C-alpha cells in the first residue's frame, strides 16, 4: 500500500509500505479520511519534531485518522468489521495510572506512542489501531467530520477528564 512520510526539508514522500495484520487487541482500518494538523505542517518544515522518544520516528504520518474496520484481531470485544471509527491520536500502555483513568495522552510508559509520530498513522490506505483508541463514529457524521475532530476534540475531552479527576 502507499503511505506518506515527512522527511523534512519542506517535503513529503509517498512510499510503499506493507499492509499490517491486527494482533491481540488491534483492528485494521481502511482509511476514509485523515486530516492534517498544525503539528504536521510544522514537521514538514522541521519546526516541530520533538526529541528522543517523543520525536517523529519516520513513520507514516497522520494523527487525525478516521476509517472503517476491515479486520479484527483476537481479544477485541467492542468493534466489528464494518464499524466506522475515529482514532484517538495517542495509544497508551493501558496499565499506568493515567491510562487507567482514561488519560492516554499522559501515559508514563515508554510504550506510549502517537499515531503518525511514533507509530504509523492515517496517511495510508490502511491503519493498524489499538481497539482501545477507536471511538465509534455516529452515523450522522461523515468520515471527514470524524477526522477533523479526532485530535482536537480528544485532547479537550481528556483535559476535562483530568480536571474533573483532580477536583475529586
Where in this protein do the model-derived segments appear?
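Short Gly/Pro-enriched turn/cap motifs at secondary-structure boundaries
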Residues: 7, 18-19, 56-62, 114-119, ...
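Cytochrome P450 core scaffold surrounding the K-helix E-X-X-R motif
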Residues: 39-45
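Short N-terminal binding/cap micro-motifs at the start of the first secondary-structure element
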Residues: 10-14, 38-39
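NAD(P)H dinucleotide-binding glycine-rich loop of Rossmann-like/cofactor-binding domains
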Residues: 93-168
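Short structural boundary motif marking the start of a folded domain
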Residues: 1-4
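Short, solvent-exposed secondary-structure boundary/capping segments
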Residues: 41, 78-79, 107-110
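Glycine-rich beta-strand-centered segment in the early N-terminal region that forms part
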Residues: 20-34, 48-100, 133, 138-141
